[in-house]
Design a protein with these regions (language model features):
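P-loop NTPase catalytic phosphate-binding loop
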Residues: 1-91, 101-165, 169-172
Length: 172
C-alpha cells in the first residue's frame, strides 16, 4: 500500500541499499495509473540493467511513451524532458494554462550529475512545476549533485529496517 504524503513534483528519495527505494518509485507511479491519470511519458533510468528491463515490461502500454535506459544514457532522458518542456512552455505561453498529460521521470540510483548533465538536470527541475512533470530521484550514498536539496521540494527517507518512507515537504 502506497503511503500518502503531501507530495510536490520534485522528489528526492534516500535510503540504504535494500531499503525499498525502487519499490517506492513503482508504487508512486502505480498510484497515478490506478487513479486513471493520463500519463504521456514514463521515463526510467537505473544502473541495474535488470531493473531497467523490468520497468519497461511492467509499464509497456500504460503511457503514450515508456522509456527505460541504463545510467550511461541518462542524458538522453534529460534531453527528452527538456524538449518536452520547451513544447509545453510554448503551449502554456499561447493558452495561458497547462492541460497537457502528466509526465513522470524516475532517476533511480543513477549516479552523480556534473557539468552539462548537472545544468540540464537543474533546468528540468526548475521547469517541472509549470510543465506538469514529476521528477523522482533516488540515492543511497551521495546526493545526485551538489546542493541537491535546494532543487527538490519533497525529500523522502526510506528506512532500511521497516521499509517505511517518511517525508518532508519544503514550502517555497
Amino acid at each position: 500500500m502506497f503511503v500518502k504524503f503531501k507530495l510536490k513534483n520534485r522528489i528526492l528519495v534516500d535510503g540504504k541499499e535494500g531499503s525499498g527505494k525502487t519499490w517506492f518509485c513503482r508504487e508512486f507511479i502505480d498510484s497515478f495509473l490506478n487513479k486513471g491519470w493520463n500519463v504521456s511519458l514514463l521515463a526510467y533510468v537505473d544502473y541495474h540493467e535488470g531493473d531497467v528491463v523490468e520497468f519497461g515490461e511492467r509499464y509497456e502500454g500504460k503511457a503514450d511513451l515508456v522509456v527505460a535506459v541504463s545510467d550511461e544514457k541518462k542524458e538522453n532522458i534529460l534531453d527528452i524532458l527538456l524538449s518536452e518542456q520547451k513544447q509545453r512552455l510554448d503551449i502554456l505561453n499561447k493558452r495561458g494554462v497547462m492541460r497537457e498529460p502528466l509526465q513522470i521521470a524516475v532517476f533511480d540510483e543513477c549516479g552523480y550529475f556534473e557539468g552539462e548533465q548537472r545544468e540540464k538536470l537543474i533546468k528540468v527541475l526548475q521547469n517541472a512545476d509549470r510543465c506538469n512533470q514529476i521528477i523522482l530521484m533516488t540515492y543511497q550514498h551521495k546526493p545526485p549533485m551538489t546542493e541537491a536539496g535546494k532543487y527538490f521540494n519533497t525529500k523522502i527517507h526510506v528506512d532500511y529496517l521497516t521499509h517505511k518512507p517518511s517525508s518532508v515537504t519544503i514550502d517555497e
